[in-house]
């Protein structure tokens, strides 16, 4: 998210939580509140998608956009990857809801509002799952009463 001088952004971090600010990674050693008073681009740790979680087209697009925020040295490369992926998605997706969201994402990124683009992409995850026929994972219960997917 980008903070500007007109409105300060207040953030609360838990002990051990990380935040990415202008490409730097900060970790709180205890519960802390921060106030960003000037222009800063940041991403909270719970919004950072890990490479192994890029299992759908929208998650892959999110990852490319995310890299523009948290790896400034790779911004140009990530931007090119993002643009290529977005172009492919316009050719692939036929759903009006997702296509409209992708148009907004394209505009947001073009205007330097990458954090807002990330929020827009995340909001489309349920629709993408619906279109892909994804079902929530439900582990069968064994005779012992434990979920088969649970750790022993």
Curated annotation (Swiss-Prot):
A molecular function (GO) held by this record is:
mRNA 5'-UTR binding
Keyword Ion transport listed? The answer is no
What's the family?
Belongs to the FlbT family.
Keyword terms: Bacterial flagellum biogenesis, Repressor, RNA-binding
Its biological function? Has a post-transcriptional repressor function in flagellum biogenesis. Associates with the 5'-UTR of fljK mRNA and promotes its degradation.
Query: Transmembrane ranges?
Result: none
Q: Name one GO biological process term.
A: mRNA catabolic process
Protein name per UniProt: Probable flagellum biosynthesis repressor protein FlbT
Q: Does the keyword GTP-binding apply?
A: no
Record gene name: flbT
Task: Give start-end of the signal peptide.
Answer: none
Please give the Pfam families that the UniProt record associates with this protein: FlbT
Q: Mind telling me which InterPro entries this protein's record contains?
A: Flagellum_FlbT
